[in-house]
Amino acid sequence: MRTQWPSPAKLNLFLYITGQRADGYHTLQTLFQFLDYGDTISIELRDDGDIRLLTPVEGVEHEDNLIVRAARLLMKTAADSGRLSTGSGANISIDKRLPMGGGLGGGSSNAATVLVALNHLWQCGLSMDELAEMGLTLGADVPVFVRGHAAFAEGVGEILTPVDPPEKWYLVAHPGVSIPTPVIFKDPELPRNTPKRSIETLLKCEFSNDCEVIARKRFREVDAVLSWLLEYAPSRLTGTGACVFAEFDTESEARQVLEQAPEWLNGFVAKGVNLSPLHRAML
């Protein structure tokens, strides 16, 4: 039997770079919220112990894909602790709607959905804490998708505190370029010393993203989309880009602006949600 699992997008409602560690990783403070929009992952169990991704991503080797890596990591971890039946495997396919290099967390969300779904389907019985710890080895954003609640993140993104920001409507736009994260983080002009503040203080301040100035400087497409959106509503970069978003109080307001968008702007309207669609589907 084939089962389907949501793999939602996320937005960074704000993102501040507070420092850089000796190992090169940047410390940050950011606010994650999910969208009721994303990819869909389909899973069909196998009994021969094999993991097969039926919808390969162009330019990504099978074993390098985060979906396959997540499945194999769970398989090994559960098997090593005697919590996996012999022969457990899976055919996995994905209906991909989220762009790569968009700052919407697509790959991390895919990995988290696979961890949560296969833990359930294989009846491994691993806790969310265990799954989140495994997820962190796959990517800094994976744990928030595993835990499934909007969160304030610190450290390199792994220290999570659940929060409940307002669930607004967003017009999310893709400028048509992909921005590799290192391009932003290696830029010498990236702000790296934004003062650390408490969650309470940050939630009262106007939200912004320290990466935005670099993305706008290096990618004229990002600058053009943001300039257009800012004529209608508060708008920011999410993550390190390339996607940007404008926030609205109602769905109709967001859709009215999208209808006016120039032909070169690709976008969609989605609601911000504090409980991940993946976890909502499991209730």
From Swiss-Prot:
Reaction(s) catalysed (UniProt annotation): 4-CDP-2-C-methyl-D-erythritol + ATP = 4-CDP-2-C-methyl-D-erythritol 2-phosphate + ADP + H(+)
Nucleotide-binding recorded as keyword: yes
Active-site annotation: 10, 141
Keywords: ATP-binding, Isoprene biosynthesis, Kinase, Nucleotide-binding, Transferase
Cited InterPro entries: GHMP_kinase_C_dom, GHMP_kinase_C_sf, GHMP_kinase_N_dom, IspE, Ribosomal_Su5_D2-typ_SF, Ribsml_uS5_D2-typ_fold_subgr
GO terms (BP aspect): isopentenyl diphosphate biosynthetic process, methylerythritol 4-phosphate pathway; terpenoid biosynthetic process
EC number: 2.7.1.148
PANTHER family given in the database record: 4-DIPHOSPHOCYTIDYL-2-C-METHYL-D-ERYTHRITOL KINASE, CHLOROPLASTIC (PTHR43527:SF2)
UniProt family annotation: Belongs to the GHMP kinase family. IspE subfamily.
Protein's name according to its UniProt entry: 4-diphosphocytidyl-2-C-methyl-D-erythritol kinase
Provenance organism: Escherichia coli O1:K1 / APEC
Gene name, Swiss-Prot/TrEMBL: ispE
